[in-house]
Amino acid sequence: MRAVVITKHGPPSVLKVRDRPDPPPPSAGQVRVAVRAAGVNFADHLARVGLYPDAPKLPSVVGYEVAGTIEAVGNGVDPARVGERVLAGTHFGGYAEIVNVDANDTVALPDSMSFEQGAAVPVNYTTAWAALHGYGSLRAGEHVLVHAAAGGVGIAAIQLAKAAGAVVHGTASPGKHDQLTKLGVDRAIDYRRDGWWKGLGPYDIVLDALGGTSFRRSLSLLRPGGRLVAYGMSSLQQGEKRSLRRAAPQLLAMLRGFSLLTQMNDSKTVIGLNMLRLWDDRGTLEPWIGPLSTALSDGTAAPVVHAAVPFANAPEAHRILAARENVGKVVLVP
């Protein structure tokens, strides 16, 4: 089979298409998926530059999520599932033509949804659901601020929060504001403007994938009883090679921004969210991907795909994501 391989740490050009052995027959409880689209996430970028500690050793195939067709099943899985269109969490290995995954980590792909849209669901929508509902305890009428609102998780959060009756504000560059408004954002905010945060809030929930200096500001925008869900560190992106020296200021800014005593006094909650860690602990994505079945079938979850990029052009997919040019999901297609 063909796969996109991180051959060494560095810029997008280190991504190469390589022939690799097909996976073995699916084990008990597994299915084999012929991949039609694979999601690209910021964690993949961090793995490529050497700043993602959970990434497999090089040369490696990353990719957390795919959509495709089941072509074989292991013992204990209904043989009738062969031929089923599914989306799936892959726990690495998604940038490939074939993957084996646990059957519990798959969800039927609605006929109305393309494979490219399906590949936008397993990471982005489970993260958004966990942040808003699983841990954020979102209630109707609450005010939510979504950083990086035009990204994959950002758009998923907008859709799920609006469906729950929340008022949603989102940060993005000005060129993306019209699209965010069409997606339902009540107020689009230009984060590049000096003092953009002044006069905003207080918010019940802030979703922060930026980290670094953004962490403290997000905390300051919460009302008492508010919840900050931190699920990313895109501020670590400093060039195309691993540099702890360049990343250190952002890491230190997060430490300076947090004090348990202050959070207790202000009655504010900080929630760290790492879907891979939850997945490892539970052994399945089902607690988070399962509740999305209804949202997928009724159109509440309607993934937006910015670009579907062939495997051979994988460096361009990573470049788009790193440059923050996308509104919605970037996916790879074999």
Description of each model-found segment:
Residues 10-13, 20-67:
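N-terminal glycine-rich beta->alpha transition that marks the start or flank
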Residues 214-298:
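Glycine-rich phosphate-binding loop and adjacent beta-alpha segment
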Residues 279-334:
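C-terminal hydrophobic helical "lid"/dimerization subdomain
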